[in-house]
């Protein structure tokens, strides 16, 4: 089964004008869980990360997904302890044997690495696992994200830039034309054999 990174900006849940976007992102994540897609994410309480964690956890409670579909990465154990998200125990601390490799990867795509302190660099390096897996040799099949107006910004930008660099398709639900993005996601799922008909995706196309 395919793996998709579900990541994005905290701003999604910090401004009231994005309520419809929150609902859409949740529906997309829940449907992906139902379809057996494995998610990768970063345990951030706000934004697409948190929405995905909640949607997948609910799908598991509903008997429509399994815990093994959640692949979550964090910088350190403290992130797990302080997280309010369900099923936070599935999170893995970044691979200790590959910390230097993740730092090098993150620095290669970050526009202002010299301005990042140790904590920020750790968070950015964690993002590399979201895209390339625990061993950095297992890239996701795609990234579905939400950033304001589709801009590449914030902590998510490292993962997005890395995905683009590696030729991994990125679908951004923060853009105005969400129907186009949803259609592109559908095409990916058809191509990967996750679905065999557009009729398999009605919940995703309910924008309200």
Residue ranges and their predicted role:
Residues 199-207:
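Low-complexity, Gly/Ser/Thr/Pro-rich intrinsically disordered linker/tail segments
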